[in-house]
Swiss-Prot record:
It comes from Escherichia coli (strain K12). It is found in: Periplasm. This enzyme consists of two polypeptide chains, which are synthesized in precursor form from a single polypeptide. Residues 561-580 are annotated as: Disordered. SUPFAM superfamilies: N-terminal nucleophile aminohydrolases (Ntn hydrolases). Keywords: Acyltransferase, Glutathione biosynthesis, Hydrolase, Periplasm, Protease, Signal, Transferase, Zymogen. Belongs to the gamma-glutamyltransferase family. This is Glutathione hydrolase proenzyme. Pathway: Sulfur metabolism; glutathione metabolism. It catalyses: an N-terminal (5-L-glutamyl)-[peptide] + an alpha-amino acid = 5-L-glutamyl amino acid + an N-terminal L-alpha-aminoacyl-[peptide]; glutathione + H2O = L-cysteinylglycine + L-glutamate; an S-substituted glutathione + H2O = an S-substituted L-cysteinylglycine + L-glutamate. Cleaved by autocatalysis into a large and a small subunit. The gene is ggt. Optimum temperature is 50 degrees Celsius for both transferase and hydrolase activities.
Length: 580
């Protein structure tokens, strides 16, 4: 049997040489879809419904809901609850995120369930005595947690757009928590690498994820009895159990005992918000993504508007000229991000100006295909924050054509590492996504301005970008990714790879990626690009830095006949796309 790693190399080499494997050329699919690990350049295929997520067990939960007659929203909520059990690195009840929904009728809406700063939060709460940001406070203390939004967001989506009752879609997650599941490679590796930094510091957490003084290993069974009880209460009593009931008591008491800020009043006051998506037109395709407090949608559309002024297809995938143009466009977008983006309920975000094609043309006119502009010479445009890599994204499409893209997170891996009392629920460290000191880069190098300063009841800025692309009025691509500041450029490349270069969803997923975020002034690249191309980029003035893999897209493409083509990212272990 040919090893998957060899197939990956073949696929990447083929992409770099200009070869293109079309979805139509794929061999006949077996009755049940298979994981992309088995074949990296042919998508998974299905006719009725499809789920792509970072965890195989959660994916199967979603497929089962679809088979039982649930729609894409029902399946998405079920997957979200399942990931809170099987992928505690980022799947959560104690965090937040965004959901993008496109109905079979063509209506598109966004659900914002981003965490909110507690009412007692203050602008300078994460500064030390010298006025400098203290990352321990904003990452690992009880002060680091914002009021969670996941449970409220899932219920808002399910009540308005789903067809199944809450207890039905929570049931699979409850069983997984109660009965346990086998720890896979991904969870075992993350417990050892990242969990060891935060989980053993808290007895509640250690009792769940540690055994005999060590983190659980691959093959161990992880049972989460307290989390099962919390899920059972949510299933029976709805989101009020989390925000006003026993679970709220557990969270508030955990905070009160340990110097945190979240109160019962903060929890009771939390509301998920339905917002109008950001949208733009790119070469005849309509691109929908998240509005603020996500910066993702605005800047994906902004960069696409800039690229529309160039013949990207002519330059070709992986060429120095194409990468130069995209990197320069990204610099301008990230510079604007630092200045203008924040919670739209608190600051006026000039999204219409930022996504205006005339503004994009003015930026395109400044891009020199032969010479990189130093970031120090770029300032936010004249118009008429730290994010973790351990977010998770999943995509769902059902038999009727409803589509859902969800990106949610605890922020860093396992969040604060703190489990609230006996709830079994890990708490986020999302407060670190605010600009603790405007103008000072966070751990990811992202610079934030006053618009994203800490404030009571405010939602921190995010790059999470669940995205749906429409062709001829029909859903064409559902995608998204984790990756912190690199989410925007990862999703951008999925769109450009698919539209401009004609890659199928598996090829677009497997193609090597690159990223520029203005500051630091470096062009970050994955392995897989031609050394000659990188030398040409350096000759153009780019500061090329070879770094580890970025992103983990989970994507579904819809063919003209309605057939579904999906791909999970081989950069992640144990993810799965499946359908029926």
């Amino acid at each position: 049997m040919i090893k998957p790693t060899f197939l990956r190399r073949v696929a990447i080499a083929a992409l770099l040489s200009g070869s293109c494997f079309s979805a139509a050329a794929a061999p006949p699919a077996p009755p049940v879809s298979y994981g992309v690990e088995e074949d990296v350049f042919h998508p998974v295929r299905a006719k009725q419904g499809m789920v792509a997520s970072v965890d195989a067990t959660a994916t199967q939960v979603g497929v089962d809901i679809l088979k039982e007659g649930g729609n894409a929203v029902d399946a998405a909520v079920a997957v979200g609850y399942a990931l809170a059990v099987t992928h505690p690195q980022a799947g959560n009840l104690g965090g937040g995120g965004f959901m993008l929904i496109r109905s079979k009728n063509g209506n598109t809406t966004a659900i914002d369930f981003r965490e909110m700063a507690p009412a007692k939060a203050t602008r300078d709460m994460f500064l030390d005595d010298q006025g400098n940001p203290d990352s321990k406070k904003s990452l690992t203390s009880h002060l680091a947690s914002g009021t969670p939004g996941t449970v409220a967001g899932f219920s808002l989506a399910l009540d308005k757009y789903g067809t199944m009752p809450l207890n039905k879609v929570v049931q699979p997650a409850f069983k997984l928590a109660r009965d346990g599941f086998i720890v896979n490679d991904a969870l075992a590796d993350d417990l050892k690498t990242y969990g060891s930094e935060v989980l053993p510091n808290h007895e509640n957490s250690k009792a769940i994820f540690w055994k005999e003084g060590e983190p659980l290993k691959k093959g161990d069974t992880l049972v989460q009895a307290n989390l099962a009880k919390s899920l059972e209460m949510i299933a029976e009593n709805g989101p009020d159990e989390f925000y006003k009931g026993t679970i709220a008591e557990q969270i508030a008491q955990e905070m009160q005992k340990n110097g945190g800020l979240i109160t019962k009043e903060d929890l009771a006051a939390y509301k998920a918000v339905e917002r109008t998506p950001i949208s733009g037109d790119y070469r005849g395709y309509q691109v929908y993504s998240m509005p603020p407090p996500s910066s993702g949608g605005i800047h994906i559309v902004q960069i696409l508007n800039i690229l529309e002024n160039f013949d990207m297809k002519k330059y070709g995938f992986g060429s120095a000229d194409a990468m130069q143009i995209m990197a320069e466009a990204e610099k301008y977008a990230y510079a604007d991000r630092s200045e203008y983006l924040g919670d739209p309920d608190f600051v006026k975000v000039p999204w219409q100006a930022l996504t205006n094609k005339a503004y994009a043309k003015s930026i395109a006119d400044q891009i020199d295909i032969n010479k990189a502009k130093p970031s120090s010479e770029i300032r936010p445009g004249k118009l008429a924050p730290y994010e973790s890599n351990q977010t998770t994204h999943y995509s769902v499409v059902d038999k009727d054509g409803n589509a859902v893209a969800v990106t949610y997170t605890l922020n860093t891996t396992f969040g604060t590492g703190i489990v609230a009392g006996e709830s079994g629920i890990l708490l986020n460290n999302q407060m670190d996504d605010f600009s603790a000191k405007p103008g000072v880069p966070n751990v990811y190098g992202l610079v934030g301005g006053d618009a994203n300063a800490v404030g009571p009841n405010k939602r921190p800025l995010s790059s999470m970008s669940p995205t749906i692309v429409v062709k001829d009025g029909k859903t064409w691509l559902v995608t998204g990714s984790p990756g912190g500041s690199r989410i925007i450029t990862t999703v951008l490349q999925m769109v450009v790879n698919s539209i401009d270069y004609g890659l199928n969803v598996a090829e677009a997923t497997n193609a090597p990626r690159f990223h520029h975020q203005w500051l630091p002034d470096e062009l970050r690249v994955e392995k897989g690009f031609s050394p000659d191309t990188l030398k040409l980029l350096e000759a153009k003035g780019q500061k090329v830095a070879l770094k580890e893999a970025m992103g983990s897209t989970q994507s579904i493409m819809v063919g003209p006949d309605g057939e579904l083509y999906g791909a999970s990212d081989p950069r992640s272990v144990d993810d799965l796309t499946a359908g029926y």
